[in-house]
Curated annotation (Swiss-Prot):
InterPro entries: AraC_E-bd, GyrI-like, Reg_factor_effector_dom_sf, YobU-like_regulator. It holds the Pfam family GyrI-like. It comes from the Bacteria. This is Putative transcriptional regulator protein YobU.
Length: 160
């Protein structure tokens, strides 16, 4: 599907598990993102989800970029929280600044395919020069509940 629309989101507080990685590292056997997802599912997630609505989305957050798409960044998996909630370790609390976001919607398909396909589209998007690299995220809501027939939205921070 691809680019959907532009939206503005206020400051958000994220809580989750984090790991430093890079796109180059994620293309090797040393990739870290799959292990972080595994770690999240093995955790007692009640602290993350206890204050949530029943349909709280899981968020994959990309933040603290070193050199835009070429350097290291922090990859985190967790949820958005109420701003005054700070969760204790092992969860990292990250504030995502208010920003305009370009929203990209994946096609429906196997989750391991559609997410990378959508990121490849973002990397070649004709307005990619507008990216601010202040924090981007993938939203896994009820549309991603069936891994073989998933659809996700990816929010990319941009200059307005």
């Amino acid at each position: 599907m691809g680019f959907s629309h532009i939206t503005h989101l206020d400051l958000k507080r994220f809580a989750g598990l984090s790991q430093r990685t890079s796109n180059a590292l994620e293309m090797t056997e040393e990739r870290r993102i799959p292990a972080l997802w595994d770690q999240l599912w093995k955790q007692d997630m009640s602290a993350l989800l206890s204050q949530a609505e029943k349909d709280k989305s899981i968020i994959a957050l990309y933040s603290n970029y070193e050199q835009e798409t070429n350097g290291f960044y922090t990859f985190s998996v967790g949820t958005f929280q109420e701003y005054d909630d700070i969760l204790p370790g092992p969860y990292e609390n990250i504030d995502l600044p208010a920003s305009a976001y370009a929203v990209f919607t994946s096609r429906i398909g196997p989750i391991e395919e559609i997410v990378l396909e959508t990121w490849k589209e973002i990397w070649t998007w004709d307005k990619r020069h507008l990216r601010t690299f202040t924090g981007d995220f993938e939203m896994y809501d009820q549309n991603a509940a069936v891994p073989q027939r998933a659809q996700v939205n990816i929010y990319v921070a941009i200059k307005k």
